[in-house]
Every structure is written in C-alpha cells, then in structure tokens.
C-alpha cells in the first residue's frame, strides 16, 4: 500500500508544530520565565532548544522519513541485522498510549471550560466560587468521562480521514486560528491597566533573582523546558517524518517548528502574566493557573465571557492538535504491526484509549485515595511521571544513539537522509557532540528529574528510585550495544 504524504510543506510544519504546542507552553513556560529571571531565562532556553531540542527532532524526522513507518517498524527497517535497536520501539509505543491516558482528560477539561466560559458561568464569580467549580468538576466522574470520551471520538474521527483530508486540513485551520486568537488575547492583556508590571516581571532580566535561585537551577530549568516542549522521544514527530517528501532538508524544518512552538510559549506569557499583575493575582503554574486563576481574572473583565471563551478555545485547539498527532501515531502502530486498515485501526484504538483513560478520570474521585507517588499525588501524576520523567528522555536517547553509532543507522546514513532536498544543511562537523555531548545532556536531564522528584521523600526512597532509573537507562544503552551480523562475521 502506497504511503500517504502531506499535501504541502506548510501542512507538515503546522501539523508537527501542533504536536509540539501543548498545555505546557501555557501553564508552565510563562511562570518559569518570570520566576527564573525573565529575558535571561529565555536566552538560555533558546540556546538549549538549538543545541538539544532541534537535534533530537531532526533524528526523529530522519528515522521516520528514511523508514516510511511509525516507530513500531522504523527500527527494524533501518537497523543492521543482528542488532537489538528494535526493542526500544516499545518506548514509543507505550509512551504514546500513556500520554493519551491522561492528555485526553486534560483536553476534555479545556473543551468543558470553553463551553462554560462562552456560556457565562464565571461572570461575576469570586475566587472561592471559581475554585469550588473546578473541584466539583474533578469530583464528578460521569462529567469528566463524558468530555474525555467526546474529545477522543472527535480526535480519532479526524484521523479516520487520513493525512491530507483529515489531520492536515484540521491542523492548518486550528493552528492558524490559535495564533490569531493568541494575538488578540495578548493585545487585550498588555493593554490592561497595571499590566506594565507584569511585562517587566516577564521579560526584563533579573540577575539578582537568578543568583538567589541559583544559576545552576536556572540553567537546568531552561534545559528541561527546552527538552520537554517539543514532544520528542516517543515517535510523535517520527510519524510525520514518515509522511514527508524528500524535497526539504530536515534541519530547517525542525527550526521552523521550534520557532512556532516558541512563539506560542512567549505569547502565552503575554496573555497570562500581565493580566495576573493587572488584577493583583499571583501568577502560578499548572492546572490551578488555567482553571482557577485565569477564570477568576476574566470574571472581573468587561466582556469576560468572550475573552475567557477565546482563551479556552485557544487552549482546546492546542490540546486537540497534540491529541490528533499522537492518535495518528497510535493508529499507525496497528497498521504497521498488524497490517490493519486505517478504519479498523482507528476504531480499535479509539475503544482502547477510552478504556485506558478511565483510571485517570477516576483518580480525582472514585480512586482519589490512591496516591502512587506519595501524599497528594494522583493517577495522572503517575502517568505523567512515566511519560515525562522516563519515556521522553529514554526514547530521545535511543534515537540519538541510533543515528550516530556504527552498529545503528550510522552517522553517514543519517546525514545523507536529513540533508536531501533544499534548505539549511545539518552541520556534519558536530558528530562528536551528537555522539557524546547530546546523549550526556539527555542522561543528566533524566537522572536530575528523578532526583528532584524523590529527594524530598528521604534518602531511602531516593536511592531506591535512582536504582530504578539506572536500570531503565541500562536497558536503553544495552539495546544499543549489540553487534550486527556483519560485524560478527568480520571478527
């Protein structure tokens, strides 16, 4: 069966950017930027995007375009016979499922709050009322299940139409609308009375604050955010590489996608931070920022139901473009592994994702007593930990090693593939960095993530979990150490 391709270069860029643009751009980046020193943090963040995020993305795109498969079959297609690289494909397969087990729930929240905002539910409400409304939603399992199932059905429905007629067409519209809505919201926010203090907090370099937090913490914060913002590591980008033509070099395409993702993150800050300062509300991070702080602000603004509705519409688009991208990856797994048709793969995957999403939904109500990562944690926290702290960095490490090691795809084959076509050429002189420096950075992010997560729980807990982290790391490195049959014969 002939491989589908994108209808246009713009379609590929917007679909891939839609996958990269996610909720973290909104509920994490602006707060981190203000907290870690404003413009100085942004500069460090951009450096790490260039030296770490973009190279990993190029690796994913390259493996996808060369193999013409999802991660479920990409390694088998390119690896030398006798090697074990294909075992690491399960990082991508499992990663996409685990990501959707909680991201569908979050997407459902966005859709529900979009409807509530346009309906005027928050007009005139105080902080206590808004906060109680969020708690009531979390405690209402049927309501949460409904919105989770609805957004899953819509997402898989789009994927059922294929790349050009479904995903590309919808993502073009949603990403364009998302950017336009963000521009309108940002202009409205920065023009609020008192917004200037927020803009200064957001952008002006505060080296004194950086020194108080610790330069090392600021650098690691920027490095981590740059790594996690691009949805790299679980094959979500690889699948779109497999639908690409060979008329464009992949380095330039990765830069374009990263620029779009960064624009969205920066604009989110212009929407949120000035508005918080204008109304004297402490800007925070995470779900409380989105579902309590922001509705409370729009409750006080003239025309708040419109502005609030637009805000949650843009968030719904951001969540939905990511959902559709990962759904396509999941559908492709079945098509590659079992030879199923797109229609059958879509239906089976939809049913499976709905079932797998229910533990996350129930983790806030029926299963609220289950705290897998310590007091106050939820099933969503566990699923997020599995994806963000494990599968994303381990999967990324696997791609980089595969593209640079002689017993993998190899540096020469990698360069030959990614430099086909027009556009910016990937520098061949950084082989040493790609082979040793970049893997080391990824390993540092991975182990530091474990340390930060479990260090507050005490030495015994920390040591136990660090052993687990090292075992997972050993698994990936072990898969990269096998010799090909050709090497064995030569020996």
Name the predicted role of every residue range:
Residues 2-6, 168, 172-320, 324, ...:
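Membrane-embedded translocation segments of transport machinery
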Residues 5-16, 41-44, 83-97, 145-151, ...:
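Select transmembrane alpha-helical segments in multipass membrane proteins
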Residues 5, 11-13, 19, 145-146, ...:
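Loop-to-transmembrane helix boundary motifs in multi-pass membrane proteins
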Residues 3-4, 32-36, 66-91, 104-164, ...:
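Inter-helical loop and helix-membrane interface segments of multi-pass membrane transporters/permeases
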Residues 1-27, 56-61, 65-90, 245-249, ...:
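Membrane-interface "cap" regions at the ends of multi-pass membrane proteins
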Residues 11-48, 197, 235-241, 252-255, ...:
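Transmembrane helix-boundary motif of multi-pass solute transporters/channels
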Residues 88-91, 95, 338-350, 385-446, ...:
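C-terminal membrane-solvent junction of multi-pass transporters and transport-like membrane proteins
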């Amino acid at each position: 069966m002939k491989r589908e391709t994108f209808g246009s270069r713009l379609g590929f860029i917007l679909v891939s950017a839609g996958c990269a643009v996610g909720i973290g751009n909104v509920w994490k980046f602006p707060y981190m930027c203000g907290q870690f020193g404003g413009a100085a943090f942004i500069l460090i963040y951009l450096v790490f995007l260039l030296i770490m995020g973009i190279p990993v993305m190029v690796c994913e795109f390259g493996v996808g375009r060369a193999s013409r498969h999802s991660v479920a079959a990409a390694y088998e297609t390119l690896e030398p016979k006798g090697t074990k690289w294909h075992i690491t494909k399960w990082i991508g397969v499992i990663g996409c499922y685990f990501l959707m087990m909680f991201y569908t729930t979050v997407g459902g929240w966005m859709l529900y709050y979009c409807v509530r905002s346009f309906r005027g539910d928050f007009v005139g409400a105080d902080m206590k009322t808004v906060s109680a409304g969020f708690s009531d939603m979390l405690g209402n399992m049927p309501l949460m299940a409904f919105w989770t199932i609805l957004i899953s059905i819509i997402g898989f429905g789009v994927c059922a139409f294929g790349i050009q007629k479904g995903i590309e067409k919808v993502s073009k519209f949603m990403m364009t609308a998302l950017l336009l809505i963000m521009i309108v919201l940002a202009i409205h926010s920065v023009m609020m009375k008192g917004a200037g203090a927020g803009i200064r907090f957001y952008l002006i370099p505060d080296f004194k604050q950086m020194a108080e937090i610790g330069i090392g913490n600021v650098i690691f914060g920027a490095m981590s955010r740059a790594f996690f913002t691009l949805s790299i590591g679980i094959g979500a980008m690889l699948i779109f590489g497999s639908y690409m033509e060979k008329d464009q070099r992949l380095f330039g395409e990765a830069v374009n996608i990263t620029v779009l993702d960064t624009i969205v993150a920066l604009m989110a800050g212009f929407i949120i931070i000035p508005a918080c300062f204008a109304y004297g509300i402490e800007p925070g991070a995470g779900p409380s920022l989105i579902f309590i702080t922001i509705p409370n602000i729009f409750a006080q603004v003239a025309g708040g139901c419109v502005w609030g509705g637009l805000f949650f519409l843009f968030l719904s688009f951001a969540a939905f473009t990511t959902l559709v991208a990962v759904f396509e990856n999941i559908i492709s797994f079945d098509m590659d592994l079992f030879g199923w048709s797109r229609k059958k793969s879509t239906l089976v995957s939809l049913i499976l994702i709905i079932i797998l999403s229910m533990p996350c939904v129930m983790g806030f109500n029926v299963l609220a007593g289950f705290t897998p990562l310590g007091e106050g944690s939820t099933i969503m926290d566990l699923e997020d930990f599995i994806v963000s702290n494990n599968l994303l960095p381990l999967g990324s490490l696997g791609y980089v090693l595969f593209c640079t090691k002689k017993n993998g795809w190899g540096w020469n084959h990698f360069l030959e593939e990614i430099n086909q076509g027009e556009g910016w050429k990937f520098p061949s002189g950084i082989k040493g960095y790609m082979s040793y420096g970049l893997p080391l950075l990824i390993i540092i992010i991975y182990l530091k993530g474990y340390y930060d997560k479990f260090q507050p729980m005490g030495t015994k807990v920390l040591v136990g979990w660090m052993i687990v982290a090292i075992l997972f790391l050993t698994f990936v490195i072990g898969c990269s150490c096998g010799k090909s049959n050709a090497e064995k014969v030569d020996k």
